[in-house]
A protein has these predicted regions:
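Conserved catalytic core of the tyrosine transesterase superfamily
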Residues: 1-199
Length: 199
């Protein structure tokens, strides 16, 4: 539900701050205008979510985790890094559900308009738009690992593939998010649903 109530505004500001903060830190942009805007106050109970710094830390960790790995763990990381960055950036940048994320086909991604066609609960389809940061992560994955992959029969159209060359499932994404989040926010039980709260 798209709203401009305090929750809707806070959600949009949180997403903007997350991405501006990340790209400012990496010197891709010179200014972070979101720091000049106060976050809307929420008057209901606190929700566990990632703050701007934690989003940056999470993405940084996924990008550089291979520095601390060897052997099979390093090989697995290299195979999944770009995919995992694309998934995390997409979840954080759009607020879509994990089930909607894993249900995406390659044809559902429209870079001309920066949108994805998602199938909502009940089967309704709608376009969800994304920013340049999400586009960059998706293009990097799709032009690299996804283009080089040979999916198993029946999984040729899937956007996100497992290391078994099948469409990723909800459980696999949930496990991936928890794995990385544990390293960055050990005191918060972060799940993909919490990433939607961050959005």
């Amino acid at each position: 539900l798209i709203t401009n109530g305090e929750k809707g505004l806070a959600r949009k500001m949180s997403a903007l701050r997350s991405f501006y903060g990340y790209y400012f830190k990496h010197r891709i942009i010179q200014k972070n205008p979101t720091l000049l805007v106060d976050m809307p106050k929420l008057h209901d109970k606190a929700i566990i979510r990632l703050d701007t710094d934690e989003v940056a830390l999470l993405l940084d960790f996924v990008e550089s985790a291979g520095e601390h790995l060897t052997g099979q763990a390093l090989n697995y990381y290299k195979k999944t890094r770009d995919r995992d960055i694309a998934i995390l950036t997409l979840l954080l940048g759009t607020g879509i559900r994990v089930s909607e994320c894993v249900g995406l086909d390659i044809k559902d991604v429209d870079f001309k308009n920066n949108g994805i066609m998602v199938t909502r609960k009940g089967g309704n389809q709608m376009v969800v738009y994304f920013g340049d940061e999400v586009a960059e992560a998706l293009k990097n994955y799709m032009a690299g690992d996804r283009a080089a992959a040979t999916p198993l029969p029946g999984h040729e159209q899937a956007l996100f593939l497992s290391t078994q060359r099948k469409r990723m499932g909800v459980q696999a994404v949930e496990n991936m998010v928890k794995k990385y989040a544990r390293q960055v926010t050990p005191n918060k039980k972060i799940t993909p649903h919490k990433l939607r709260s961050t959005y």
